[in-house]
A protein has these predicted regions:
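Conserved N-terminal beta-strand and adjoining loop/helix that marks the start
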Residues: 1-22, 42, 70, 93
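Nudix hydrolase/Nudix homology domain
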Residues: 35, 103-161
Length: 161
């Protein structure tokens, strides 16, 4: 494996008025037996702002164009292997309130690792038997629904796979 890639990323927790969260089930390139559920988002391109990154990622990954970026609710540093590369990714998670829509991915490269989309009731996230990422997603969503955006962000979650 080559040197570690350092990357900044922004992700959106898409939340409906019915308290559903949109998740994407993805698998490792070339290994459809290893999969997990993630929220949409991705890496910051050179020169992009937070807003530009989230707008591009949500357009590419789920076809969402018209939305307002809500509060920052979580952050983590995730080190993992992807497509033969070691990546250390610093992620920030934002709430985005949306009406339920039919997601559609337009990024062909990412579509190769997408198994499906699913709207999950927030109350069912805690009972998920499949891997969610971040692992604390059920608590993040429940905390936001109970108390709104945190006054102070929790400690940086550090995860090394």
């Amino acid at each position: 494996m080559s040197n570690m890639i350092q990357r900044q990323a922004r992700r959106a927790i898409l939340l409906t008025p019915e308290n559903e969260v949109l998740l994407m089930r993805i698998h490792e390139p070339g290994n459809e037996d290893v999969f997990w559920w993630i929220v949409p988002g991705g890496g910051i391109e050179p020169g992009e702002s937070l807003e530009e990154t989230l707008r591009r990622e949500l357009r590419e990954e789920v076809g969402l164009e018209d939305f307002e970026i809500g509060p920052l609710v979580w952050r983590r540093q995730h080190t993992f292997d992807w497509a033969g590369k070691r990546i250390c990714q610093n992620e920030q998670y934002y709430i985005v309130h949306v009406s339920r829509f039919e997601p559609m991915m337009s990024d062909l490269a990412e579509a190769k690792v997408l198994d499906r989309f699913q709207w999950w009731p927030a109350t069912e996230l805690i009972h998920a038997t499949e891997k969610l990422t971040p692992l604390s997603l059920p608590q993040i969503v429940a905390g936001y629904l109970d108390s709104g955006a945190p006054q102070e962000l929790p400690e940086l979650e550090i995860l090394v796979d």
